[in-house]
Amino acid sequence: MAGTVVLDDVELREAQRDYLDFLDDEEDQGIYQSKVRELISDNQYRLIVNVNDLRRKNEKRANRLLNNAFEELVAFQRALKDFVASIDATYAKQYEEFYVGLEGSFGSKHVSPRTLTSCFLSCVVCVEGIVTKCSLVRPKVVRSVHYCPATKKTIERRYSDLTTLVAFPSSSVYPTKDEENNPLETEYGLSVYKDHQTITIQEMPEKAPAGQLPRSVDVILDDDLVDKAKPGDRVQVVGTYRCLPGKKGGYTSGTFRTVLIACNVKQMSKDAQPSFSAEDIAKIKKFSKTRSKDIFDQLAKSLAPSIHGHDYVKKAILCLLLGGVERDLENGSHIRGDINILLIGDPSVAKSQLLRYVLCTAPRAIPTTGRGSSGVGLTAAVTTDQETGERRLEAGAMVLADRGVVCIDEFDKMSDMDRTAIHEVMEQGRVTIAKAGIHARLNARCSVLAAANPVYGRYDQYKTPMENIGLQDSLLSRFDLLFIMLDQMDPEQDREISDHVLRMHRYRAPGEQDGDAMPLGSAVDILATDDPNFSQEDQQDTQIYEKHDNLLHGTKKKKEKMVSAAFMKKYIHVAKIIKPVLTQESATYIAEEYSRLRSQDSMSSDTARTSPVTARTLETLIRLATAHAKARMSKTVDLQDAEEAVELVQYAYFKKVLEKEKKRKKRSEDESETEDEEEKSQEDQEQKRKRRKTRQPDAKDGDSYDPYDFSDTEEEMPQVHTPKTADSQETKESQKVELSESRLKAFKVALLDVFREAHAQSIGMNRLTESINRDSEEPFSSVEIQAALSKMQDDNQVMVSEGIIFLI
């Protein structure tokens, strides 16, 4: 192998002696002697050695170990076995081999799967990434013992391949006959096997360069290292990089498959923990005490400061980042603590921007889109291993985001089958797979933040929210909060938004060059290296508030302070650790408010309800109140936390969209009435007021509107009277003509006959006049027809619009 130096026996013994001197450090600090004694007492056979210690004691040997791993590791492991034998000879005989695992600083050999190139072959490297695939654990034969009944002899054979540290692999043929063709029987009790597993680690998604796919590398785990990692874990793997020749038909191709033979697997913290100093903790405590009254509002305002408005949505996202308290009850049931939020609304209301902010702020977040995600891609897939042909599990986005946040954009574009796949994850926090002979359960305890557009592209305010949303109740009830974000035309608000957006475009970060594109991620691939001499004094001081900038924050908000993003991350990280307990007062209040929500749900119409009020809503109230208490750094959930949670739920569940629409219509009616005052007499005004008085009780009714019911006087009826067309003005003028009861009754009968003959729900004015007067002895004049239609319109029996009569 290129770059490999084969040690002769003399050099091997010298290396073994050096490593033995390193381990026998009783005269020094006695670190490794105590570690070996612990290894014996714990019945282990792998010793973890810090490379930095070896480098300080014998730099030459440390460099050789990193650059010529196979021979040096063999010498190191022999030295370890000799050292164990010197302490406990009987224990050393229990195991055939003792293993050495490495940790510490690897310098240029600390790489990611992308930078793992051919120059690292036969070297010890430290690779970090995220586990995407795991094979099943299989036993692999190390030594087989065979008995020949004919000759009464026992044959022993050892096996080694390129996945071991032995330089020359042995034949892998399993003997069935001896030299004289006598059959052999395998003595399974005397044979030795080791556990064998293959995993694939992939470059971390946030560290992959822009425009390039994440790379991956196969890792071989043996003995005690198997099952150290599962799909979704972030790990550091220290091992030897080796290439395996691929033989096809007796020939070896010029390209080789490479693997990493692991000697140590270290779990990285699933949360990208910010480094804390003592000053940071003191600042967090001081901030929570000084701003105890309005701390929740202060933090919510500082979330996504580049987005104007959406105060309630920001409060909900802050609750999502903090989370509730998860509970595993004695009877085996699990109550989730993660908060799920769905944002539904018109285009261009900053839904996707809010998702992107969460991606940057949350300690662990995975982005996906509805169209680019399948059900198995979100949960877990069973794939076939190309080499062995066996089935294995591959983790999906929600498993990879365990204890984090999954942001799903364009949620409405997903197919129904894919959406149903995430039902179990959103409530139980796990993925259960029972496919192709594999039955597995993976943890996926993640919060879901989803954004979707309404069914019709834009939100139709004349349809119920359930019709606009178009998702199943079973899915909606799993979302704790559902926000309808509307793009409403309000001149004052539009002016504020335009001012805010223009300031954002004029703002330039310090040091930004002319014409330079802002980087989306970190330009440098930051790898986590353990530094034993790390001191926190080198840390930069974290500022609580951002420095005020007129362009960035606006001139009107000089008094408002924005919490800096760095401090926000640290504050959320500390606040998540707290587990507040419900007080009796808050528990009683939540129970009362829940029963009120249920009764409000049954009394009010469907138009006001955005998602079903179920028993999950009660858990939602508890989770939101707990998150609010976490924001205050409180150990108890008090009444103010419960009140804030109820306010959020009231806003999200019962957003009275149609009421706002009615106010706008009323305003437009008032404006049109002021114009009519100049043109019409006082008598017309009084009649209009009378008609509006008879109309007002109708608007208060909460039931849905049925266009085929004569007696129906529902809340959508104001829509009938809104347009001020020429026909409606003629109708008001024609009200001066009084019709007798008999004449009106005759008109109604004739009108119904005309509609019956036409087999239609609408008919034109000219056709109506012609049909009514065709067989009538006393024809109706146009003024009489207008007066009769006006009377029937007031009684909600017909609707006249642009010369067409609609039967209601």
UniProtKB/Swiss-Prot annotation:
PROSITE patterns: MCM_1 (PS00847), MCM_2 (PS50051). Gene3D superfamilies: 2.20.28.10, mini-chromosome maintenance (MCM) complex, chain A, domain 1, Nucleic acid-binding proteins, P-loop containing nucleotide triphosphate hydrolases. Early fractionation of eukaryotic MCM proteins yielded a variety of dimeric, trimeric and tetrameric complexes with unclear biological significance. The MCM2-7 hexamer is the proposed physiological active complex. The gene is MCM3. It comes from Homo sapiens. Residues 295-502 form the MCM domain. The modification Phosphotyrosine is found at residue 708. This is DNA replication licensing factor MCM3. It is found in: Nucleus; Chromosome.
